[in-house]
Swiss-Prot record:
Domain free text: Has four distinct domains: an N-terminal nucleotidyltransferase (NT) domain responsible for UTase activity, a central HD domain that encodes UR activity, and two C-terminal ACT domains that seem to have a role in glutamine sensing.
Keywords: Hydrolase, Magnesium, Multifunctional enzyme, Nucleotidyltransferase, Repeat, Transferase
Functional note: Modifies, by uridylylation and deuridylylation, the PII regulatory proteins (GlnB and homologs), in response to the nitrogen status of the cell that GlnD senses through the glutamine level. Under low glutamine levels, catalyzes the conversion of the PII proteins and UTP to PII-UMP and PPi, while under higher glutamine levels, GlnD hydrolyzes PII-UMP to PII and UMP (deuridylylation). Thus, controls uridylylation state and activity of the PII proteins, and plays an important role in the regulation of nitrogen assimilation and metabolism.
Name of the featured protein: Bifunctional uridylyltransferase/uridylyl-removing enzyme
Organism annotation: Brucella suis (strain ATCC 23445 / NCTC 10510)
Length: 934
């Protein structure tokens, strides 16, 4: 960013200000240290400060650049301090022949050192000396500080020589962090460079894990103080979760570990993609803009975005009201989205550090020792003691004497609810070589490990400690292979090992009843499988353990489970169950999200795979944990509804409750049931309506929805409207249903999905029906955006209006798509190999076309349009998004209702779809589908 971009000359003209002070000094009769001269100098600097701040605020209001404003204010302060220090050393307290001891460097540290300030930010200064302070130096420091304080600035300061800086940085993490941000301002630059070199060599080198763990622990403590959630309605912009300090922490740890000076260097190192760097800069800019506006608006260092100032800040940032949402709500929504982005960046960077084994030295809460120094034995042999609520080793050789103690340490910590003493962990780390084949096969060690894994307390916490220490990967080498393994895509938020630990945490929460509202079925089922609960914990630990191998990780993982389970002490029957669960851990998610659950063949095929109710229960809970632990925002109510539907439908088959009535008999029953619900209609009108839908409609749509559709169509007919839409929010499922009644034509679904995309609707499912009088009744499900049904209904009605306008010709779809949809820029960093499969075995009635490719705006509209152009009728569409990747399934027939069985025609369909997806030469068309969870 150049000075021209910053327009620094509009903030303060350094030469003009310096010349003005020198002219005042040259013409003054008083001593430079006199009170009158001091007042003149002070007023000149205060005027420059006020003018510069006013200019910075004006520029912020015009260009909106938060980072620009922070840099401008920093430049203003740099200029004033430089000129003041020069005046102090050359005019107020000049030295004719300064000795080496009187050299001094003025250094910006802390937040000021990072090069960005809000109006009320603290100014942290280090007066750096070569040796001890001199009388002359004391005068300069005192003059400079008092002038800055009298200018109304909050100045934090220290006066130290280099040896003192190094010693204190070694002892105090806060001082170390402040020096990490050190930036030369004025004075002796060689002195500052010496500090930089010694800090790098004597402090940074070799202490990366210690620093990173301390910063992350500090962040966690700060979150607990400010509020765990980033969605606090009155967030602290500086200290809250997802706020500025989180961004600072990210840069601190990467700067410390990778020895970089700028965020841009992280791209070259592969830590951040260019899209992620842009996201980082965008979040930083927004948070700076909010914080700078808050300081300007309140005339103080206000960091809490409270209710009373939210309206003014929203106005300053230029937000305006939209239908159903006022300008403050739009601003706060933007704030929360940025806070979420900061959380995403935290995961990205922490995962990259884990991948580089930056955290191989475990860190734990270092609690100040209490007055009590009592120790008590924790084991019969006296190997472990409890010391101030931390488990420690009683002797330095206990791991060498009995390597099982390396597992027993964690077992006892879990049983007694203890943290870990650093001494114990250091000894453990030095003893990792003792974990060998003999220990891995030791029955007692495996018994203890299984009890840790299946603990009724908080197994994730202890397993995380085992992982951080290196014990888990050594004890289970297959787990060690996936520690810090990154999956380079936009779907998975965590390393594989982190994902597995989070899965176990979710299961523990379900078992403790903490998620009964969000996951009612899992909450109920967990109480019915007490005998098999251990199998779920083992499965969750192992289900992704084969990631990163050339073969399907589910199959390879099942093979690993078959080998490990007997070692853990599981019976042959239990081992068989875990092996099956690992092999099929993606199946339920895949079927629920990408298959038509109203198609009987889907349910029967899935029941054939599951075979027993016990397996069905275990697989449902496993799937919930797996999806929920992928990352924030991945789980939603719609996925929960799909899984519950699949569970209940399969339960009927497995328990013998599934109807074996013929299709015709079920159609007859459904029509009679609807006729009964419409008994208040005139018979002639009722009979005419019952003749409209085809059999497939009655066999797949619930009776309540059939009644709702009947009144919907009746009202449209009475009003003489050929084209009409209806919206219905589903809060628990987190989707909103939009029903469209329109004259049928081949590209209707393409137009509807395109209109949804243009209106900002994210489609997750679509059901298409035609009536005997040539109309289409299409039901589209879009992701929910608002908390309240009223807000969501208004939003859905706006989407419906766009659909009506496009279908009626009032709006031109291509123009709307061009205006309203933007590519996901982050997705450009990824490649998804296009895939098309055509399958005639998944449904008795329909051909299933499954496509996979890189997501882009309007893709669903393009796909459905092409399928229609290929003379195919779409009965249903099932849309699944995994970050940058989409997997869409379409249930189709030809125009006379038959499956697509001709090989030549299938080949043509594949080629056309692959071309649309961007494949070269009609590339890959077969292969196992990459599926939903983890």
């Amino acid at each position: 960013m150049s000075a021209h971009d910053l327009k620094l000359e509009e903030i303060v003209n350094a030469e003009t200000l310096r010349r003005k002070l020198n002219e005042l000094a040259d013409t003054a009769d008083e001593s430079y240290t006199s009170l009158p001269m001091r007042k003149v100098v002070l007023q000149t600097l205060k005027d420059a400060l006020a003018s510069g701040r006013a200019n910075a605020e004006d520029m912020l209001m015009k260009d909106g650049g938060g980072t620009l404003c922070a840099k401008r204010l920093c430049y203003l302060m740099d200029t004033l301090i430089d000129i003041l220090f020069e005046f102090a050393t050359t005019r107020t307290y000049p030295t004719r022949n300064p000795s080496k001891a009187e050299n001094m460097a003025l250094v910006a540290v802390g937040g000021y050192g990072r090069g960005g300030l809000a109006q009320g930010s603290d100014i942290d200064l280090l007066f750096l000396l070569p040796y001890k302070q001199t009388p002359w130096g004391e005068q300069v420091v005192e003059y400079t500080l008092y002038m800055l304080w009298d200018m109304g600035l909050k100045v934090g300061h220290s006066t130290r020589n280099i040896d003192e800086c190094i010693r204190l940085a070694r002892e105090d993490m806060t001082i170390r962090t402040a020096l990490l941000d050190a930036r030369f301002l004025t004075g002796d630059k060689d002195l500052f460079r010496t500090l930089e070199i010694r800090f790098e060599e004597e402090i940074v080198k070799g202490t990366e894990p210690e620093f990173i763990q301390a910063k992350l622990a500090e962040r966690d403590a700060r979150h607990r103080k400010a509020g765990e959630t980033r969605y606090l309605v009155e967030p602290n912009v500086k200290e809250g979760k997802g706020g500025q300090r989180d961004l600072h922490t990210l840069f601190w740890i990467t700067k410390y570990f990778y020895r970089v000076k700028t965020k841009e260097e992280l791209v070259k190192l592969g830590v951040l993609s260019r899209a992620e760097l842009k996201l980082f800069n965008k979040a930083e800019d927004f948070l700076w803009a909010v914080r700078c506006h808050m300081h300007f608006a309140t005339l103080k260092a206000e960091e809490r975005l409270s209710f009373d100032i939210q309206p003014e800040i929203a106005q300053r940032l230029g937000y305006t009201a939209h239908p159903g949402q006022n300008y403050v709500e739009r601003f706060m929504k933007h704030y929360f989205l940025v806070a979420k982005d900061v959380g995403d960046l935290t995961r990205i960077i922490c995962a990259a550090l884990e991948e580089q084994q930056a955290k191989h030295v475990p860190g734990f809460n270092r609690i100040f020792l209490t007055f009590s120094r009592r120790k008590r034995k924790l084991s019969d042999d006296g190997a472990f003691i409890s010391e101030n609520h931390r488990i420690n080793i009683a002797r330095p050789d206990i791991f060498r004497q009995d390597p099982v103690n390396m597992i027993r340490l964690f077992h006892l910590a879990d049983r007694h609810g203890l943290e870990f003493h650093p001494e114990a962990m250091q000894s453990l780390t030095r003893s990792l070589k003792l974990i060998n084949a003999d220990l891995r096969e030791n029955p007692e060690a495996n018994r203890l490990f299984l009890e840790i894994l299946t603990s009724p307390r908080n197994p994730e916490l202890i397993l995380r400690r085992m992982n951080e220490s290196g014990v888990l990967g050594k004890f289970i080498p297959d787990f060690g292979k996936i520690v810090a393994m990154m999956q380079f895509n936009m779907y998975h938020h965590y390393t594989v090992d982190e994902h597995l630990l989070r899965c176990i945490a979710v299961l523990s929460e379900i078992e403790h009843g903490e998620l009964k509202t969000e996951h009612p079925l899992s909450n109920h089922l967990i109480t019915t499988i007490k005998r098999d609960r251990n199998l779920l914990y083992v499965t969750l630990l192992l289900h992704d353990i084969a990631k990163g191998r050339p073969e399907d990780h589910s199959i390879a993982g099942a093979r690993i489970a078959r080998r490990l389970c007997p070692r853990f002490g599981l019976t042959p029957s239990e081992t068989e169950t875990v092996e099956w669960l690992v092999r099929e851990h993606l199946t339920m998610s895949m079927v629920a999200q990408s298959r038509d659950l109203n198609d009987r063949k889907t349910i029967i095929d899935f029941a054939d795979t599951v075979q027993t109710m016990e397996r069905l229960k275990l697989l449902l809970i496993l799937t919930v944990c797996d999806i929920k632990a992928v990352g924030p925002g991945i789980w939603n109510g719609w996925k929960g509804q799909l899984l519950r539907t699949l569970f209940y439908e399969t339960e009927l088959v497995l328990t013998g409750g599934f109807s074996e009535l013929s299709r015709a008999a079920r159609d007859k029953q459904a029509r009679e049931a609807l006729a009964e619900r419409l008994s208040d209609w005139p018979k002639e009108e009722r009979d005419a309506y019952l003749a409209l839908p085809y059999t497939n409609y009655f066999l797949t749509v619930s009776l309540d929805d059939q009644v709702r559709h009947a009144h919907f169509i009746r009202d449209a007919d009475q009003q003489g409207r050929a084209l009409v839409t209806m919206a219905k929010p589903h809060a628990f499922e987190a989707v909103t249903e939009i029903t469209v009644l329109a004259p049928d034509h081949p590209r209707l679904l393409s137009v509807i999905t395109g209109a949804c995309a243009a209106a900002g609707g994210n489609i997750v499912d679509a059901q298409i029906f035609t009536t005997s009088d040539g109309r289409a009744l299409d039901t589209i499900l879009i992701s929910r955006e608002f908390d309240t049904d009223d807000d969501e209904r208004r939003r859905a009605e706006r989407v419906g209006k766009v659909i009506e306008d496009v279908l009626s010709g009032k709006a031109h779809l291509p123009d709307m798509l061009a205006k309203r949809t933007k590519p996901k820029k982050a997705a450009r960093a990824f490649k998804v190999e296009p895939r098309v499969e055509i399958n005639n075995t998944l449904s008795n009635k329909f051909t299933v076309i499954e496509v996979e490719g890189l997501d882009r705006p309007g893709l669903l509209s393009e796909l459905t349009g092409l399928i229609s152009d290929l003379s195919l009728d779409i009965a249903s569409a099932h849309i699944t998004t995994f970050g940058e990747k989409v997997i869409d399934s379409f249930y189709v027939t030809d125009l006379v209702g038959h499956k697509i069985s001709n090989a030549t025609r299938q080949g043509n369909i594949k080629r056309k779809l692959l071309a649309l997806l961007g494949a070269e030469n009609g590339a890959r068309t077969n292969g196992r589908s990459p599926q939903a969870a983890a």
